[in-house]
Design a protein with these regions (language model features):
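DNA replication initiation modules
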Residues: 151-244
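Signature for HUH/AEP ssDNA processing cores
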Residues: 2-142, 152, 207-218, 222-244
């Protein structure tokens, strides 16, 4: 029994060290790996659209003076209708816009549960240790961990949609410093992406992992987020989906 416990503890310790370690910077984006990763994302069902990229001096490639989200927003205001999984279109974008980041529109096929990095790392450890299925996970060097999940409902079927107090949209990001739920009307950067200051967004768990039901992750994510915020988790209150 003690040997089994010791082995489990040792594995969890190694996982913890790996999650907290700095992984090498991705160089594949400059060597052709960028296009392959984007096509893999589209192949997994993530609709993509071109996004801005870093410009010298911590600026954004867009024309907006003092852009509040440099390199983190779509190029087109029509990103929701523009986003696609079409291989040929994504190849054209990737080759004609070699510096562009890409966003994936949420709420059509998938959602993203977006957490502060340390809380997210703890939650990921707990989920894996509990044997809960976890899908693709991306890490942003600006301090967020992104859990990719199935969507709660499709835009075509309004009866399958219900609101949640964690729902986050691009214009309300600052109102959600803790756990954010990117669903319909929102987006996130998809790896590989570059941020100002030589930062980036990269996969921690790849697209080979199936998208899980978001509700299977939510309790541990909420609990870990509350622990890092110094709050008591309220699983029966704010943060849980509310049907009407």
């Amino acid at each position: 029994m003690s040997a089994e416990l010791g082995g489990r503890t040792g594995r969890q310790g190694k996982l913890s060290q790996w999650l907290r370690g700095r992984r090498p910077k991705e160089t594949g984006a400059e060597e052709g790996g960028r296009e392959a990763l984007l096509l893999a994302a589209a192949g997994a069902g993530l609709p993509l659209a071109p996004a801005a990229y870093p410009a010298p001096g911590y600026r954004c490639s867009c024309d907006r003076v003092g852009c509040p989200t440099p390199a983190r927003h779509p190029v087109s205001f029509a990103w929701q209708t523009q986003s696609t999984t079409d291989r040929a279109q994504i190849e054209r974008w990737a080759r004609h816009q070699p510096q562009a980041n890409f966003i994936t529109a949420t709420g059509m096929v998938h959602d993203v549960l977006d957490m502060p990095l340390e809380a997210g790392r703890e939650a990921l450890e707990r989920l894996l240790a509990a044997g809960i299925e976890v899908g693709p996970v991306a890490e942003s060097d600006d301090g967020r961990l992104l859990f990719f999940t199935l969507t709660r409902g499709t835009p075509e079927d309004e009866d399958e949609w219900w609101p949640c107090e964690l729902d986050c949209h691009p214009e309300t990001m600052d109102e959600h410093p803790g756990l954010r739920w990117h669903c319909r009307g929102s987006y996130v950067l998809v790896p590989p992406a570059r941020l100002p200051g030589d930062q980036g967004v990269h996969w921690v768990r790849g697209l080979e992992h199936p998208l899980p039901d978001p509700l299977s992750l939510l309790e541990i994510l909420t609990d870990s987020g509350a622990r890092y915020a110094g709050e008591e988790p309220d699983h029966a209150g704010a943060g849980w989906p509310l049907r009407h």
